[in-house]
């Protein structure tokens, strides 16, 4: 699954109420530090060092997906604290899909976790149509923007 990142609670929300399958999220390595590191470790996050090209992420993702697991990623790479509808997407979600021949399930979370204001919208799962990672990443961005607008 791939979509917007509006708050630290996104992973819990998606994992807890949107599927019966476990979702292993790609998340910044810093989350493994105290005080909550043990919780993130227990949740099985796939840690990524965002300061470097972390070569350990794709093998971990490939293993999970090859075993029928589900991986969650926030293609913006961080929580969007800007006024922009989304930040430019990184290519990881499309790479994961292409390398593992698996569908991408786009989603949008709209709202800032104020009482009664949160909405989640899922799109249709799809396979990228081409091997053009740049083009397919832009297409994923467009799908997520459409979902955000449908949440308004």
Predicted regions mapped to residue ranges:
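Short hydrophobic segments within beta-strands
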Residues: 1-2, 26, 74, 107
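Helix-adjacent hinge/juxtasegments
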Residues: 38-39, 43-72
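Catalytic core of membrane glycerolipid acyltransferases/transacylases, capturing the structured
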Residues: 2-52
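Short alpha-helix boundary/capping motifs
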Residues: 30, 54-55, 86-87
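Non-catalytic C-terminal accessory region of glycerolipid acyltransferases
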Residues: 58-152
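Short acidic-hydrophobic sequence patches enriched in Asp/Glu that either
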Residues: 35, 53, 88-92
